[in-house]
């Protein structure tokens, strides 16, 4: 089971400002992620640049429109993520409880969402051909 731990953005992260206690935060994150590695559950982790360095693609009918950042509502955006793979939801929840507070000096939150696995789509008739092709891609990526 794969889970994404998402660190919610703040006005500071959206401004590209590192907190005054950034050294303490980086140290706590390094220790936590090292524990994930030792447990064999870490798949990936990274911080995201502010939305001003990104863009969105808006779909209207068959038309695609690129909209450059920055975007409003920082609290709805993600400032970073950690992707883990665990045997159970409970194990993922335990790792989440140990996640360092992303912003020591003010209120913040993380959100955790489980990723779909290909087997989750096995009963969807329209997905059956695509599932086989996605499995081939997974095999190629692992080589």
Go through each PLM region and give its residues.
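Conserved, structured core segments of small domains
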Residues: 1-143
């Amino acid at each position: 089971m794969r889970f994404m731990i998402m660190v919610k953005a703040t006005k500071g992260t959206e401004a590209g400002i590192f907190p005054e206690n950034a050294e303490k935060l980086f140290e706590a994150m390094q220790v936590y992620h090292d524990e994930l590695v030792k447990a064999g559950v870490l798949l990936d982790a990274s911080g995201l640049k502010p939305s001003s360095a990104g863009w969105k693609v808006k779909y209207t009918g068959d038309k695609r429109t690129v909209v450059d950042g920055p975007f409003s509502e920082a609290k709805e955006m993600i400032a970073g993520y950690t992707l883990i793979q665990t045997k159970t939801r409970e194990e993922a929840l335990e790792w989440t409880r140990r996640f360092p507070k992303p912003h020591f000096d003010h209120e913040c939150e993380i959100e955790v969402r489980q990723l779909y696995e290909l087997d989750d789509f096995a009963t969807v008739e329209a997905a059956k051909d695509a599932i086989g092709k996605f499995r081939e891609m997974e095999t190629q990526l692992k080589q």
